[in-house]
Curated annotation (Swiss-Prot):
Keywords: Amino-acid biosynthesis, Arginine biosynthesis, Cytoplasm, Lyase. This is Argininosuccinate lyase. GO terms for cellular component: cytosol. The keyword Amino-acid biosynthesis applies. It comes from Neisseria meningitidis serogroup A / serotype 4A (strain DSM 15465 / Z2491).
């Protein structure tokens, strides 16, 4: 007699090599607690529809409680001979309670069972991720509030462009994370649909009531097509895509932190606990955490491509290919959760160096656009103002000074519209304060946005 639940069809046992190759217990046992949740809800529904009696349900609940304790204490022995988490738990349950354990799988297939387990697990991961996104946003909001007036260069093409504040810069990432949170919430709506009851692919002949199971498991909707229910992994791809975008955003911030911490910039310092040294160079303080975040973003993006590729050629309904969805999905969630958790802590350990930031602003003619706007407001067409200021910048560059350091008579040599009030717009602070509109970089607007985000998060 074979040891497989499906072995009656076969004339010889599966080879050891095939067992090792096809077994998923090494990674899908992670779904054990969610598998038990689904089984308990399924058992309750079977009892309410008359498939199981009260005694069977009581035995199943007792047995599952014991198995759950074994799992949490690390005492359960997982067997690759039983292939996966579902059969391991079912065999353990049957060993404990006998025939009632064998009845549990009535009206159910591993196809809809695993699809349910993954959705239950992923739903919980998304809840954790959304909380961690908000925690990181809070850390960034604290930095933004503290640095609403801390002038730094805004860049395009990594060249000094216009003055902004460090607070305004941090708020850009708060906005990105806000969209990330929205995407996760939207993804969760599609994750939160129950496939259980689809059985192998066509449904079941038993008088099941899927709405009972859905309510017990907290699913907001029920998958309406049994073929789609067992073969759908859109939700996994969608989650991994949303996770990839978060990692891309954090990778962009990491790149900036790495640059800003370098002596060539010197805009910030990162607390020692997030950095490492060199085995040969005593002076080194390396920003390993943001570097690793930058690297791990590629890992998560790779999982997205892997899942899309996994699904692209599968006919309906379930195929063994889908066993390969779990490891990239698990690793995506783990990587994202770990990254968000450490990132919030790291941002609380960032020290800003305002003097270095302001000095960088003064080296790049960052207020040139402000001078052009000044001339336009005095009646000069913008294209003419652009040309006049370009000539002034070239002169200042050759003289080795900032526009604000040019004498008035020199500036007036470029246009007689220039008066001594020009110096109010040529300072970085004047440039910031002039942009006092919704979404602008003025300190007043930064404080408004910080307040708005705090109120939305409350």
């Amino acid at each position: 007699m074979h040891d497989k639940t499906w072995s009656g069809r076969f004339n010889e046992p599966v080879s050891e090599l095939v067992k090792q190759y096809t077994a998923s217990i090494g990674f899908d046992r992670r779904l054990a607690e969610w598998d038990i949740q689904g089984s308990l809800a399924h058992a309750q529904m079977l009892k309410e529809t008359g498939v199981l009696d009260e005694g069977d349900l009581a035995d199943i609940r007792r047995g599952m409680a014991e198995i759950l304790e074994e799992i949490r204490s690390g005492k359960i022995e997982w067997s690759s001979d039983l292939e996966d988490v579902h059969m391991n738990i079912e065999r353990r349950l049957t060993d404990k309670i006998g025939d009632a354990g064998k009845r549990l799988h009535t009206g159910r297939s591993r196809n809809d069972q695993v699809a349910t387990d993954i959705r239950l697990w992923l739903r919980d991961q998304i809840t954790v991720i959304q909380s961690l996104i908000q925690s990181l946003q809070t850390a960034l909001l604290d930095l933004a509030e503290q640095n609403a007036e801390t002038v730094m260069p805004g860049f395009t093409h990594l060249q000094v462009a216009q003055p902004v504040s460090f607070g305004h810069h941090m708020l850009a990432y708060v906005e990105m994370l806000g969209r990330d949170n929205e995407r996760m919430a939207d993804c969760r709506r599609r994750v939160n649909r129950m496939p259980l009851g689809a059985a192998a692919l066509a449904g079941t002949t038993y008088p099941i009531r899927r709405e009972i199971t859905a309510e017990l498991l907290g699913f907001e909707q029920i998958c309406q097509n049994s073929l789609d229910a067992v073969s759908d992994r859109d939700f996994a791809v969608e989650f991994t895509a949303a996770a990839s975008l978060i990692m891309v955003h954090l990778s962009r911030l990491s790149e900036e932190l790495i640059l800003w911490m370098s002596p060539r910039f010197g805009f910030i310092d990162i607390a020692d606990r997030f950095c490492t040294g060199s085995s040969i160079m005593p002076q080194k303080k390396n920003p390993d955490v943001p570097e690793l975040v930058r690297g791990k973003s590629g890992r998560v993006i790779g999982h997205l491509i892997g899942l899309i590729t996994l699904m692209k050629s599968q006919p309906l309904a379930y195929n063994k290919d889908n066993q390969e969805d779990k490891e990239p999905l698990f690793d995506t969630a783990d990587t994202l959760i770990d990254t968000l958790r450490i990132y919030a802590d790291m941002m609380r350990g960032v020290t800003v160096k305002p003097d270095n930031m302001r000095a960088a602003v003064m080296q790049g003619f960052a207020t040139a656009t402000d001078l052009a706007d000044y001339l336009v407001k005095k009646g000069m067409p913008f294209r003419d103002a652009h040309e006049v200021v370009a000539q002034a910048v070239r002169h200042a560059d050759e003289a080795g000074v900032d526009l604000s350091e040019l004498p008035l008579e020199v500036l007036q040599g470029f246009s007689d519209l220039i008066a001594d009030d020009v110096y109010g717009v040529l300072t970085p602070e004047g440039s910031l304060n002039a942009r006092n509109h919704l979404g602008g970089s003025a300190p007043e607007q930064v404080r408004f946005q910080v307040k708005r985000w705090r109120e939305m998060s409350a």
